Amino acid sequence: MTHILFAVLVLALLALAFGIILGFAAVKFYVEADPIVDQLDALLPQTQCGQCGYPGCKPYAEALANGDQINKCVPGGDATMRKIADLMGVDPQPLGSAEAAIPVKKVAFIHEDQCIGCTKCIQACPVDAIVGATKAMHTVITDECTGCDLCVDPCPTDCIEMIPVPTTVDNWKWDLASVAIPVKIVE
């Protein structure tokens, strides 16, 4: 019994000593983060889709702080690019290349008759837009899907297809900045 108490006491003292050492090291070797990277990261949509060419939003924010192009975030769209331009003090640019200036929004569609319920697409989806259970068919919540295309490659049966979202009154992007609105000033 005394051997057990002695072992517990020694482990507790070691844990306390290592905790003090780690606390001291955290204070002594603290590295100040770049505040602009944190601000840029807060503006990005956090989908971690990789369409910008970086493995996630934080690495893209670091690249933006180092002077990379501000128009690579497709899920963030034009609004995010304009916020980044305002923060960085640069002119807004069209998204992607010249052909991608007007992107076609796409969402994932699962052909449920071909789905085997492997859950690989659910694991790949960064925004949890796919619902389903193991060995049961899955489906996509289209309002949540960002169209990042990350769920297509892991699917072993190729039952996921990216389809364009039809333009309706509900999802139409009105360009009110270019529309002249007549105003009459009454005195």
UniProtKB/Swiss-Prot annotation:
Annotated residues for binding of [4Fe-4S] cluster 2: C115, C118, C121, C155
Every 4Fe-4S ferredoxin-type domain range: 106-135, 136-165
Keyword Iron-sulfur part of the UniProt annotation: yes
Any one annotated GO CC term: plasma membrane
Protein name from the UniProt record: Ion-translocating oxidoreductase complex subunit B
Subcellular location: Cell inner membrane
Organism: Aeromonas salmonicida (strain A449)
Matches recorded under NCBIfam families: PRK05113.1, rnfB
Cofactor descriptive note: Binds 3 [4Fe-4S] clusters.
Family affiliation: Belongs to the 4Fe4S bacterial-type ferredoxin family. RnfB subfamily.
Chain's role: Part of a membrane-bound complex that couples electron transfer with translocation of ions across the membrane.
Lineage: Bacteria, Pseudomonadati, Pseudomonadota, Gammaproteobacteria, Aeromonadales
GO-annotated biological processes: electron transport chain
Broad enzyme group: translocase
GO molecular function terms noted in the UniProt entry: 4 iron, 4 sulfur cluster binding; electron transfer activity; metal ion binding
Record-listed [4Fe-4S] cluster 1 binding positions: C49, C52, C57, C73
Classification via PANTHER family: ION-TRANSLOCATING OXIDOREDUCTASE COMPLEX SUBUNIT B (PTHR42859:SF3), OXIDOREDUCTASE (PTHR42859)
Chain intervals for the UniProt region annotation (Hydrophobic): 1-26
Domain 4Fe-4S, first and last residues per copy: 32-90
Coiled coil as UniProt keyword: no
